[in-house]
């Protein structure tokens, strides 16, 4: 016999064959019974003393106490699974000898409980459930606290725990309120009852539901199903993001883990979408998203149309500096640029090349520096090579002023005036630009 800690965590299914008992032989089994109409709010009490006190067994059935149990090893999740300790609860319940049963022995209930079928939803019991028996054989279970009985009315719903199926604890899933408001919900607590109206995860789009589009509940007091669910108009976001705590049944309605999930196989979601009409605000937002922006002229087109001087603003025309030399069309934005340009028209060339034998003079210093780089820093040219102006030479020294050897290397200690001719012999007219 395995430890009772492992037995309470196992899910056993009981096959009951009662050919010797009928509704007349068992007085406690004469009223109709449905797991969804159970007056107790906890999952464990669905088969405890208050809910099992009035089940209806099939008339042509017999019960055998010593019936051997069948071990099911199918890969599918256990259906109609509950704990064996729940069957032994209650005073009027038939006491079944459960001490010799193994924890994996399973017997199906769908043939003997009305309202259940092969697709019945799994009723999982939380693992934190306190263990109420003491003996390892658990011949009986401590009596559960009696809950107040409620009238078995369709509109009086007991508060059920979050471990029950969504179809049993959520009124949004239990009946289609839009198309069939007065139809009684089937007794089966399976997922197939809501396949014909539940939308898939791809069709859950944000929509505004107006009061005129939703048919109200029938008149009469309605017990709130759970604290996790409020009134139905604000119920859709909660239903979409709700994920059951049990890992065996956790199917996130918002983020399915695979392409072939129960949610992806749900059909009939088009009927659900047709019940909701897009609100004007939502429709306007969708139309604005698809509208193309109006074509505006680009900045380049505006600049090209205003490139001519006639179209320039007056403030830009005032800063135009034109060259006053006849025949020159030079225009400058700054006055210093115009002054530098005017030197090219004058005879003043104060910047003279210092290389011996070169008599080039320039009106601007930048022109002289360009002359040094392009003319005297290269070997094999028609002008004299100067090693002090060559950046690749080991004698590079742009500040050197003195005598040079025939191959262009500097003669340190010499003065530039020694080899320079008299300045009076040179005329400014002989200098090249």
Curated annotation (Swiss-Prot):
Supply the InterPro entries for this chain.
Answer: Znf_C2H2_sf, Znf_C2H2_type
Q: Which SUPFAM superfamilies match?
A: beta-beta-alpha zinc fingers
Q: Where is the composition biased (Basic residues)?
A: 288-302
Asked whether the UniProt record includes Ligase among its keywords, one would answer: no
> Major place of localization?
nucleus
In residue numbers, the region (Disordered) covers 24-49, 240-269, 286-306, 391-423
Which residues lie in Low complexity bias regions?
30-49
Summarize the record's disruption phenotype note: Completely destroys asexual development, resulting in masses of vegetative hyphae that branched into the air and formation of white cotton-like colonies.
Q: Where is this protein localized, as stated in its record?
A: Nucleus
Q: What is this protein called?
A: C2H2 type master regulator of conidiophore development brlA
Which is an annotated Pfam family here? zf-C2H2
PROSITE patterns this protein is in? Answer: ZINC_FINGER_C2H2_1 (PS00028), ZINC_FINGER_C2H2_2 (PS50157)
Q: Which organism is it from?
A: Penicillium digitatum (strain PHI26 / CECT 20796)
Judging by the UniProt lineage, the source's domain of life is Eukaryota
